[in-house]
Amino acid sequence: MIDLAAKPFYLKPEDIEWVNTTLAGMTTEEKAGQLFCVLFKECKPEEFEYVFNILKPGGCMYRVVPTERAIAATQNIYSRSKVPPLIAANLEKGGNGIVTEGTLVGAPMEIAATDDIGMATKMAHACAAEASAVGANWAFAPIIDIDTNYRNPITNTRTFGSDPERVRRMGRAYVEEVQKMGLAASIKHFPGDGQDERDQHLVTSINNMDCDPWMN
């Protein structure tokens, strides 16, 4: 039995009662749906109609859409969800990771070039403030990969650079700020990627680094 009052949940008695009551009232299909996070590319009503007729997902991810559409999407999702949903976006550079009108603060490598963790905090603040304004509560960020090839098309400027210590400091500052703002941070890593100069979405890329330097 999971102790919901203990780490990492720390729920109050009334919160635990809500969890138990809600869980008891869910069908097997609804419970299974909580395991899914569905990508909505355009956040249009017909997308939600199609998905929610198949399952009731516990999480949804938005691509970049206009602000009004993102707000309408959140309202649509909440109206269909028995459990408050997780709503995520790639909040790597600013609020522009979720809405077209969002603020582009700077790519992580630009932020790292300042060598000022205060800038990472400001970028994270913009991400969290603008995403939460349209209902998002989950950041698919920060990326904590280490840049090992400036020609790599996947990570490169999406990272906080080639210095592991700077990556750690910047990534930590981002996580602390978005969590303080009430969003969940999901540290992102692309295992084995970063060495090749080709896009692994299009071809099978190659990691030619030996095991020892890769692990260290």
What would you call each of these model-derived segments?
Residues M1-N216:
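Glycoside hydrolase catalytic-domain context in secreted enzymes
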